[in-house]
Amino acid sequence: MPKVALYNQNGSTAGDIELNDSVFGIEPNESVVFDAILMQRASLRQGTHKVKNRSEVRGGGRKPWRQKGTGRARQGSIRSPQWRGGGIVFGPTPRSYAYKLPKKVRRLAIKSALSSKVNDNNLIVLEDLNLDAVKTKEMAAILKGLSIEKKALIVTADANETVELSARNLPGVTVVEANGINVLDVVGHEKLVMTKAAVEKVEEVLA
């Protein structure tokens, strides 16, 4: 079982914590992680692109000139695709880009991402994370005490509005609850900070 240091809010070591081997100690599968990131990014696409086809462009109901006798090429509408200002053929229409990977693949991806953080010594586990009031300065001090200088993902067991608001103005810091942890967030932040309760909750779901 992988073992990591357990810290308090002051940045001092408060002992060790053993992590579940089937969640934090597997061999990371990079290809599955990549697939999961593509899936998440696809679902974030807006998909509101739209062009007008020949039936939607204004005008063009009258035949521009008679079929025969003019010496010109026959035309049925000034809004057919070959005309300037005409409709677009096979253009983009509003659609959803979202798709889902199988549940087993999604679970393997998040386990691989978590195990990578352990392997790279980028997982920090806190005994607890409690703030008396919304204080960005206090949250910044906690992160500094943990020697976190780059992007960090903070995972709490449940929704914690005080922590979320305190970290909101810190660049590169994101707060999610354990139920909302995902591959894109884990991979997109160098440091992963989890409370002990959040670790237990994640292990309960994924083990």
Curated annotation (Swiss-Prot):
Origin superkingdom: Bacteria
Entries under InterPro entries matching the protein: Ribosomal_uL4, Ribosomal_uL4-like, Ribosomal_uL4_dom_sf
Gene Ontology biological process terms from the UniProt entry: translation
GO cellular component terms attached to this protein's record: ribonucleoprotein complex; ribosome
Cysteine disulfide links: none
Keywords in alphabetical order: Ribonucleoprotein, Ribosomal protein, RNA-binding, rRNA-binding
Composition skew (Basic residues), residue ranges: 60-71
GO molecular function ontology, one term from the record: rRNA binding
UniProt keyword Membrane, yes or no: no
Renumbered residue ranges of the record's region Disordered: 48-86
Described function: One of the primary rRNA binding proteins, this protein initially binds near the 5'-end of the 23S rRNA. It is important during the early stages of 50S assembly. It makes multiple contacts with different domains of the 23S rRNA in the assembled 50S subunit and ribosome. Forms part of the polypeptide exit tunnel.
Homology family: Belongs to the universal ribosomal protein uL4 family.
HAMAP family, sorted: Ribosomal_uL4_B
Subunit structure: Part of the 50S ribosomal subunit.
Protein name: Large ribosomal subunit protein uL4
Source organism of the structure: Bacillus licheniformis (strain ATCC 14580 / DSM 13 / JCM 2505 / CCUG 7422 / NBRC 12200 / NCIMB 9375 / NCTC 10341 / NRRL NRS-1264 / Gibson 46)
Gene name in the database record: rplD
